């Protein structure tokens, strides 16, 4: 964060960053841990938290640890309602047909991708839970790499090395991205780019502990679903 920020914009930036830290934490953090992550005094973190609590965006449990509030769900529903209506039926269909968790991810910023919508199969031996809001580097995992396929090289993050460039070139030629053991240990992912009118670069992907079908046939199923989502969303 720049020291030249105006007080109002700096406070807003810190509040947003606080929400991001809470969302990325493996367990609800304490106020002291939030202050440390923000590199601010505990009193500053406390005031930010009070504001978030007043809007239902965060809350403290009986032990004093901080979690995200239900108000965020209401905000998210408003942002993605049209996309939910267009994508969820297709994600459910793919998940149930292939027996794999299906998700839609978008580019969050220059460095990260975030899952917006996910669907789990109704009947399968092993169900992989992958919640909306899950963030990971755009250079790791099938969903992020599929997004890179749709971007020119100059729009890639600076840490894309020659090995990853070669992998992306291969993925672009075959039309899909493949990953194993990159974002979540032991999980496989197949993903394809997805174009959504008026939205950031996106991808549609499946994840599972194995590949129960040929990766090429999985990719073709994802492409068909992606085309229907794009048409429904742009209608």
How does the language model describe each region?
Residues 1-81, 231:
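N-terminal helix-turn-helix
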Residues 58-59, 104-105, 194:
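A structural signal for short hydrophobic beta-strand segments in well-ordered beta-sheet cores
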Residues 63, 109-110, 197-199:
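Short strand-connecting beta-turns/loops that link adjacent beta-strands
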Residues 67-68, 73-156:
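Amphipathic alpha-helical effector-binding/dimerization core
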Residues 160-232:
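Extended hydrophobic
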């Amino acid at each position: 964060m720049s020291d030249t920020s105006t007080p109002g914009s700096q406070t807003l930036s810190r509040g947003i960053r606080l929400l991001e830290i809470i969302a990325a934490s493996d367990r609800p953090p304490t106020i002291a841990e939030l202050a440390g992550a923000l590199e601010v005094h505990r009193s500053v973190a406390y005031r930010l938290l009070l504001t978030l609590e007043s809007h239902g965006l965060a809350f403290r449990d009986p032990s004093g640890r901080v979690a995200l509030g239900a108000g965020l769900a209401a905000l998210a529903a408003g942002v993605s309602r049209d996309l939910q209506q267009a994508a969820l039926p297709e994600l459910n269909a793919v998940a149930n047909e292939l027996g794999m968790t299906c998700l839609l991810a978008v580019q969050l910023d220059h460095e990260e991708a975030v899952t917006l919508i996910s669907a789990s199969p109704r009947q399968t031996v092993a169900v992989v839970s992958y919640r909306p809001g899950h963030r990971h580097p755009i250079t790791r995992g099938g969903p992020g790499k599929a997004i890179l396929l749709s971007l020119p090289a100059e729009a890639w993050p600076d840490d894309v090395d020659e090995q990853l460039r070669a992998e992306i070139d291969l993925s672009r030629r075959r039309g899909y991205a493949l990953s194993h053991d990159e974002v979540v240990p032991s999980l496989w992912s197949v993903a394809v780019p997805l174009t959504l009118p008026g939205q950031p670069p996106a991808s549609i992907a499946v994840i599972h502990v194995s590949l129960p079908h040929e990766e090429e046939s999985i990719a073709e199923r994802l492409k068909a679903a992606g085309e229907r989502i794009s048409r429904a969303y742009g209608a």
